[in-house]
Amino acid sequence: MGDGGETSHTVILARSFGIPLLCGVTQSEGLTRTASMLLLDSRYGVLVANPDATMENWYRLETQKQQAIAQRSAPLREQQVATSDGTTFSVLANIALAVEAQSVFAHGADGVGLFRTEMLFCERSLPPDEEEQYQAYSEVLKSAEGKKITIRTLDIGGDKPCEFLDLPKEENPFLGYRAVRMYPQFHEIFTTQARALLRASAVGPVNIMVPMVATLAEIQWLHSQFAHVAQTLQQEDIPIGEWHLGIMVEVPSTLYLLEKAANYLDFVSIGSNDLAQYFLACDRGNPYVRHLYDYRNPTFLALMRDITRRAQAAGLAISLCGEMAADKQMLPLLVGMGLTQLSMAVSAIAPCKETLKVLDAQQCRQLLETAIGCDTSEEVTECVEHFMRAQSHKPVLAKELLLLDKTVSSKEEAIKLLTDNLEVQQRVVSGALAERAIWEREAVFSTALGFSVAIPHCKSPHVLHSSISLLRVKSPLSWGEGVDVQLVIMLTVNDQEQDNHMKIFSRLARKLMHSDFREQLQMLSDASAITELLSAELAL
């Protein structure tokens, strides 16, 4: 599309239903008329007219990889996940439109941890009336069938204006007039939303969450306002059901309000995006200070831990929503904090559940204290990566790393097949990063060994588990410099295991000098038999 941003209805709907979409593409109409074929990759923001055979093949392989990853995680959709020591988790979804609800439940969400209601109010000249809002909230609650639903009240301000609100222009809208701070002035809009939310509670239990709260006075005001609206509805003989009131914890001052706030609230939800921004005093949209916005900062981790502990001590239910919840590397730290409800984009739900299954909560608590004791976020990252490798240990060699008798047309395809499989098997952060590391080594010298064998290899921090992969092709494959190969043995080693890398490489190179060893690798038809052979000969 030529127009549209991250918050437009079209973009949100496309994302919800898995439809690839690019915005801000100039001359897109001309391309659709003149190109016989268009290739669209919304992950990297790429639109290619008339792609050549090489690019088509690359995307064919990429699609196969994504399908394999989806198939791997599919069984988790119907399961509530627990850590290896039995701590159960609710993995929730963030949505912006009611129509998204059914889709996120189909993709494994245990509920909705954040329903942003701004889309009901924006891109229109008048605010939605009570009935329109009631229907939208009821639609989500019906789809939930009793699952947890948290609906956030209107989060509008100077940086997110609405046409029908006469808002002042502010030098720093992130610190200005927004969200709960506006409700007294625009009381009718606030009350209309409150009525619609409480009416919808008759359809199913609902958590009502208010953003940008900074003081106890605001909490007391909100409590009295919702109590008054509930009383008014009862006087009008309008049924209401189970509802709970909570706030977003995104202003650091709320840390010290939680004990008193428990007299007026039922739950809190940490909004890590804004909380990090306010705690570290940096505008995350400002390129000059963007580097300071870092939720891996040890002091921010300590803040998160303290918020969680204080909320739990006060008897408040607590959850997390924001980019941090969707970061797989942060999960062991979040588990260590004691958070058991995480809300994220639907695409992150399955990977999150997969990671949670292998974690031990007690060990995660120890990891958190170690991370908080680090000096930098880089040290935190290194600490977590080391922990994750230990938590989900994988042997260097396994039969799922062997791809036998494949039809492969190029060296590029061979390397992508092997590195993509490493991602499918959860041995690298991403296949693309592993592939890049392999090609960086290939640029130094060709890894063709002779005897129709190539040994591409790399050491990289993006390798989670050092691995030996094998590809056997049906027909000889050009490896460059006039050399053809039929057997590709790839070594991918974490950069902390350099000594192990060299030992395996040396043993393998020596063994490949022997024709009987090469013949066995070429002739054996069973992946298990080849795995046993390599394990024995390389002393793995």
Where is each model-derived feature located?
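Fold-independent oxyanion-binding glycine-rich loops
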Residues: G2-G4, V25, D41-R43, N50-D52, ...
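Histidine-centered active-site/metal-ligand motif
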Residues: S8-H9, Q312, H457, H501
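A generic structural motif
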Residues: L38, A214, V493-E497
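Cytosolic covalent-transfer regions centered on His/Cys nucleophiles
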Residues: E382-L540
